[in-house]
A protein has these predicted regions:
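A charged, aromatic-enriched C-terminal amphipathic alpha-helix characteristic of glycosyltransferases
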Residues: 182, 327-368
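A short alpha->beta transition loop at the rim of the catalytic pocket in nucleotide-sugar-dependent
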Residues: 273, 300-302
Length: 368
């Protein structure tokens, strides 16, 4: 009889966020490894849906799973003041109610979550909990302090620096994100001279730094050799950047693809030569701990990678394949691009190691 994995999260689906994509990608490969997966999440947005076909189309997967969208009659999304406080209160109440209502005492239950309060309440009921930790926060520090030494709790940290911030943990492992290799095609036509960025243009409401990057792209005349292709972003963000592009007179060299589905995104990435990692230093997670899905997609697609010089990017696996730049330094972007041309492609073993199939196998070996 197949084991059932309860993937319980305060995220909602479908959503354009990288974290929702990461969750669905993990679920897909848990299923491919032979587990039954039941996804529980709140129907907290007007666009939220627990229709399997809707999620399959949005995220480009065919695997079947059980989905339980749970009604969300809580302040977050309904009260438009003190939004951060409303989020934390709602997250706490929803998690406590979900664990209490949908799971009766059964030691066979296994949970996978990136939700602090789901991990907390499930662990306190002695269920096996696999808790994926992506960043620090005061609530997370409290939760891990309370349950980190439980023998039934297994914690996955996205990088070593994050793991080292937490002591006295019984079971933990460092696992970066991985790539869904099913989305890639072989033997595509020759790559075009383009730098590509795939993802949201802001994080937590703060720009990732594209206006500054575009100015550097223009100042160092990168457009003479490489176009810039941007996949993703809300319409208002794209319009703002188009204004910057127009003011810099580089409209002929910057292509805005807008939002694309997973297959279309990967196809565009595969057609380019260089992948871009860009973020804002004001966010601790972006600066110290991020493990972006796009990075693994870039290198699996055999792109060179250039990245703003943050500790999080230097902590990525195979970081010797990355060329770093500093937007405050003269010709830094040009130097990084030239260095990136000399990087060797990944070996077959390296490609296997960054796959989601390998990542999920490591999770199963660690916690099952």
């Amino acid at each position: 009889m197949k084991q059932t994995l309860n993937y319980v999260t305060y995220q909602t689906f479908p959503a354009s966020t990288a974290n929702s994509l990461q969750s669905i990608s993990n679920i897909k490969y848990f299923i491919k490894k032979g587990l039954n997966v039941c996804l529980y999440f709140p129907l907290r947005e007007k666009t939220s849906s627990d229709d399997l076909k809707v999620l399959q189309e949005y995220y480009s997967f065919t695997e079947s799973l059980e989905i339980k969208g749970i009604n969300h009659y809580l302040p977050h999304g309904r009260i438009q003041i003190f939004k951060k406080t409303m989020f934390h209160i709602s997250h706490f109440l929803w998690s406590r109610r979900t664990i209490s209502k949908y799971f009766k005492k059964n030691n066979e239950e296994i949970f996978f979550t990136r939700s602090d309060w789901i991990a907390f309440f499930a662990a306190r009921k002695k269920y096996k909990v696999i808790f994926e930790c992506h960043q620090e926060s005061r609530i997370r520090n409290f939760v891990i302090k309370k349950i980190g030494d439980y023998e039934n709790v297994y914690i996955i940290f996205l990088n070593k620096d994050l793991q080292e911030n937490y002591k006295n943990i019984s079971n933990s492992i460092v696992l970066h994100n991985g790539v869904d290799v099913d989305l890639f095609e072989e033997n595509l036509q020759q790559k075009r001279n383009s730098i590509v960025y795939a993802g949201n243009l802001s994080r937590f409401g703060v720009s990732r730094g594209f206006p500054e990057f575009l100015k550097k792209y223009n100042e160092e005349k990168i457009f003479q050799e490489f176009n810039l292709e941007i996949i993703g972003g809300d319409l208002d963000q794209i319009e703002d950047l188009k204004t910057v592009v127009k003011d810099l007179n580089i409209e002929d060299y910057v292509i805005f693809h807008g939002r694309k589905n997973r297959s279309e995104t990967i196809n565009i990435i595969q057609m380019c030569k260089i992948g871009l990692l860009l973020n804002n230093a004001n966010n601790t997670h972006s600066y110290q701990h991020t493990s972006p899905l796009k990075y693994f997609e870039y290198i699996y697609a055999k792109l060179s990678v250039i990245a703003i010089d943050f500790p999080s990017h230097r902590s990525l696996p195979l970081n010797q394949k990355i060329s770093y730049f500093d937007l405050d330094k003269n010709r830094s972007l040009n130097v990084a691009i030239n260095q990136s041309k000399n990087h060797d492609e990944l070996s077959a073993a390296e490609l296997r190691d960054i796959s989601l199939e390998t990542r999920i196998k490591k999770i199963l070996d660690f916690a099952f």
